Amino acid sequence: MANVALLSAASPSTSSAAPRLRHVARRRPSRRSACPRSAASRLSIMAALGEDPIRQWILTEGKATKITGVSSIGGGCINSAQCYKTDAGSFFVKTNGRIGPSMFEGEALGLKAMYDTNSIRVPLPYKVGSLPTGGSFIIMEFIEFGCSRGDQSALGRKLAEMHKAAKSDKGYGFYVDNTIGSTPQINTWTADWIEFYSKHRLGFQLELITQRFGDSAIYDKGQRLIENMHPLFEGAVMEPCLLHGDLWSGNISSDTDGEPVILDPACYYGHNEAEFGMSWCAGFGGEFYSSYFEVMPKQPGFEKRRDLYLLYHYLNHYNLFGSGYRSSAMSIIDDYLRMLKA
């Protein structure tokens, strides 16, 4: 992809009307199950073969003359993560031994789009490529995290500033399809938000559930909701804003100055309220919302729509982690069907 190739040139330098849900918020599951090949073994193999594109980039375009250390900094079975320490500073590297560059290309485009808004801090992506042992990598700016998630008020304000700054004249969608967790996320440009959210978010997840679990009951009810949800948007002014797309607590931090940092996006241009879809796993407080709505005013019917945006992520968690999330998703659907008399 030409757009991603350009990155390699960068150098480091609730109201009563709302449905009443019975689901219980829970922590997002860990993905640290056994992986087919560890990042360390892949790196060792590449070093032995003398074919390490990560080191090659760092020692050329990364402007380092030597790498002083490589340390693991977590990750899971989707990706592994390392910090490369050099005489030109540190680099954050993610690798995946099974998936080609397209996943990281989507991440890089999202990071760069958010970075270019000059609003909230995100790591700048430098390079995406293939690994000779199979799989792919992404090199990006290393941000030293502080001791906390930072100030909730600042997070709300800066997130709203990003939404306000980055609008799309192409409609709703993104330049490429990407992933939400490991689930494909379809981002075909669409002029109408309700159509986009119906087809490429709720509808797509419901189809996956049917394919993977044969759950026709949730599919049928979900389709009834999609067909009848238009009244939830009456009076709302909607514009395609750049969204992080997967804003849960694990993707929110702060730098050593206490400024908020967001990472690991699943970006697309969408209705700004959709950004709160992972709020059940993000810990947003009153200060966050107050500061956010000072910049991006709350639209009529916000409370009625809030759980509609939670639904996308509950359906995705059903697809990713199994039927433990089914009751939460079905609860939201049932409550909306009652409210809409559908």
Swiss-Prot record:
Top EC class for this record: transferase
Transit peptide location: 1-46
Matching SUPFAM superfamilies: Protein kinase-like (PK-like)
GO cellular component, one term: chloroplast
Domain of life: Eukaryota
Coiled coil: none
One term of GO molecular function: ATP binding
Family: Belongs to the fructosamine kinase family.
This protein's name: Protein-ribulosamine 3-kinase, chloroplastic
Protein source organism: Oryza sativa subsp. indica
